[in-house]
């Protein structure tokens, strides 16, 4: 066994686990139905498409701000995600964006990192779920 792989007769490397993060997303289909009822099919699809594009851009922007350690602007960007996600029924994404802003407010940088990257995972899955639910093509 190579050096560093065994500890007290126990093969450490053989015991390494990979944690797979799989987040459940929650979509409020009633919000989407209400949007379609209010705006009609064409109007609602336009709103949903623009919201999805904006969410994708802002998620990327949030990650960039975190890497630059720009907490005030990260907070603003995360807050902006809440309203957009709520508008099209992405309840999980909106809640995690609230968690990011809360972690920033209490200066808990470990929590900011954890919740931000949870937001990235949920954001990606939420965007995919809305595309699939609406049967939209990119």
Q: Whereabouts are the PLM-identified features?
A:
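Two-component system phosphorelay core
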Residues: 2-76, 80-138
């Amino acid at each position: 066994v190579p050096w560093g792989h065994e500890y007290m007769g126990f093969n450490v490397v053989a015991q390494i686990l990979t944690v797979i993060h799989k987040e459940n997303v929650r979509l409020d289909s009633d919000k989407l139905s209400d949007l379609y009822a209010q705006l009609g099919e064409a109007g609602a699809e336009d709103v949903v498409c623009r919201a999805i594009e904006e969410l994708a851009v802002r998620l990327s922007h949030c990650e960039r701000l975190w890497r630059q350690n720009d907490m005030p602007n990260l907070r603003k960007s995360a807050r902006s995600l809440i309203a957009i996600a709520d508008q099209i029924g992405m309840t999980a994404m909106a809640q995690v964006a609230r968690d990011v802003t809360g972690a920033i407010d209490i200066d808990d940088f470990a929590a900011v990192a954890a919740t931000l990257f949870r937001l990235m995972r949920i954001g990606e899955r939420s965007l995919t779920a809305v595309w699939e639910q609406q049967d939209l093509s990119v």
